[in-house]
């Protein structure tokens, strides 16, 4: 016999979710003893508490994986021109000179064109 007829979705109350989250924050893995205490206090079965913890750990793994992927994508993207470092004295160097930190399109158009610098970086 399959369990599909018996299955139903448990909707937890705000209080139940809060208590389960508090317990999860304390420990990601619940002990047998604490599981039975929590189930009795919240009016849930031990099986429901166990499944909630399994699902919560899966959710945490999913969120952490997504965060890690976002961080990797940010590290792979080049720095925007407005965030390029300036010389130590804080003044922009003229474009086109050797050692200049400001990118230029002088080689393409024939005339130097400095990158705009945010006001907070100007002397």
From Swiss-Prot:
GO terms (BP aspect): anterior/posterior pattern specification; bone morphogenesis; pattern specification process; positive regulation of transcription by RNA polymerase II; regulation of somitogenesis
Tissues expressing the protein: Intestinal epithelium.
GO cellular component: nucleus
Keyword Ligase found: no
Segments of this protein annotated with the region Disordered: 57-123
Origin species: Rattus norvegicus (Rat)
Family: Belongs to the Caudal homeobox family.
Function: Plays a role in transcriptional regulation. Involved in activated KRAS-mediated transcriptional activation of PRKD1 in colorectal cancer (CRC) cells. Binds to the PRKD1 promoter in colorectal cancer (CRC) cells. Could play a role in the terminal differentiation of the intestine. Binds preferentially to methylated DNA.
Residue ranges of the region described as Interaction with 5-mCpG DNA: 47-58
Entry protein name: Homeobox protein CDX-1
Subcellular location: Nucleus
GO MF annotation: an example: DNA-binding transcription factor activity
Basic residues composition-biased segments: 57-68
DNA-binding region: 5-64
Interaction with DNA, as annotated region: 8-29
Keywords: Activator, Developmental protein, DNA-binding, Homeobox, Nucleus, Transcription, Transcription regulation
Principal subcellular localization: nucleus
């Amino acid at each position: 016999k399959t369990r599909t007829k018996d299955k139903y979705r448990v909707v937890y109350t705000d209080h139940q979710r809060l208590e389960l989250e508090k317990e999860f924050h304390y420990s990601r893995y619940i002990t047998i003893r604490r599981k039975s205490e929590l189930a009795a206090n919240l009016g849930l079965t031990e099986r429901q508490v166990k499944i909630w913890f399994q699902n919560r750990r899966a959710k945490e793994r999913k969120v952490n994986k997504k965060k890690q992927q976002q961080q990797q994508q940010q590290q792979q993207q080049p720095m925007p021109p407005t965030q390029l470092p300036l010389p130590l004295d804080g003044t922009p160097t003229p474009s086109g000179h050797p050692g200049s930190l400001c990118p230029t399109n002088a080689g393409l158009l024939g005339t130097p064109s400095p990158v705009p610098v945010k006001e907070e970086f100007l002397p």
